[in-house]
Amino acid sequence: TCSTTMPLRYSDFNFGTKLRQNEEAVSERKDWIGTEKERLNRLMAAECDGIITGLYEYWCCYQPFFPTKTTFIPFPIVVGDEPKIAPEPPKQLNLFIGISRNRSVYKGTDIMLRAAEKVKADYPERLNLKVVTGLPFDEYVRTMRGSDAIMDQLYSYTPSMNPLEAMAHGIICIGGGEPEHYALLHETTLRPIINVLPSYESCVSALTQLVTHL
């Protein structure tokens, strides 16, 4: 759907009405469109009694075709103990970026990293940047703790499991937090995510605003 009817302004597969042509997006389309995977997906969607979508993007793609059996249930997260947050803001922001091997361009962490490096160069005394690559989820979470903010999910309207885990530990998320996501949650007040558009300029602007207003 993201490659044909394109209900999203941007996604892993499109910018507006244009298909993304990066290697990962092209590979994903070849893997799904016109293949046994697609046929199985269509069969399951047609014959099942209900479709549970965990992200706005999934809901947006399934609901128009299956309006009576598509239900949105947000991804769950184990909150655990209340995070310990220092009473005073830090003098230097500890920013964490986790990079998945071979999916950096697809997920936009390449752009987020360039933006973070730019802000680090402009405000070296205000930003401490920690970058990790290819960590298993448990190790990712352990390494992320102690950070003040993370950058993740550039092409998403919503937070995935990594940003949700971060926020459960009191860590600021810079990434996907579009109004449509909050509307589906019926949330009219809280906006915990620093939303960025899928561009280098938007990431630089948002991070600069954060580090200069600690």
Predicted regions and their residues:
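Short hydrophobic beta-strand element within catalytic cores of glycosyltransferases
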Residues: 172-179
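Helix-loop-beta element that forms the nucleotide-linked donor phosphate-binding surface
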Residues: 41-53, 58-77
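Acidic donor-binding loop of glycosyltransferase active sites
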Residues: 145-158, 171
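Membrane-proximal helix-turn-helix segments that form the acceptor-binding/catalytic region
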Residues: 16-51
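Short alpha-helical segment that forms part of, or immediately flanks, the ligand-binding pocket
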Residues: 141, 163-168, 182-183, 187
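Conserved active-site histidine-acidic residue motif and adjacent donor-binding/catalytic loop
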Residues: 132-143, 155-159, 163-164
